[in-house]
């Protein structure tokens, strides 16, 4: 069987200034912004996260502000099949990930 785990918590912020949003959430969560993380670029800011915890990422978006989870799997097709059997549906297939929606409407 393949392996999957909670990989990241993304805080989607409808803002023109992702740096201000990242600083706010860093202070709320008692962390720093990690400017050297390879994920800190463009519309994304990574917060300092211990290696045994899910990544916390601030993302500038144009839709309403919300929070979403990223699930990491070593076999994406198998994980999509498993989640579909549980009642999730595919919303979009992108280059390296699949956006899905839970039966209760949350996207992940």
Predicted features by range, described:
Residues 27-30, 77-78:
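Short, basic/low-complexity N-terminal boundary segments at the transition from targeting/disordered tails
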Residues 29-38, 86-93:
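Short secondary-structure junctions
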Residues 15, 50-51, 64-65, 69-104:
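Vicinal oxygen chelate
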Residues 31-67, 107-108:
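Conserved short beta-strand elements that form part of the metal-binding/catalytic scaffold
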Residues 9, 58, 88-90:
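Hydrophobic beta-strand residues in large extracellular and virion-surface proteins
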Residues 7, 43-45, 98:
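Extracytoplasmic/periplasmic beta-strand context in beta-sandwich domains
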Residues 1-23, 28, 67-71:
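N-terminal beta-strand motif that seeds the catalytic metal site of vicinal oxygen chelate
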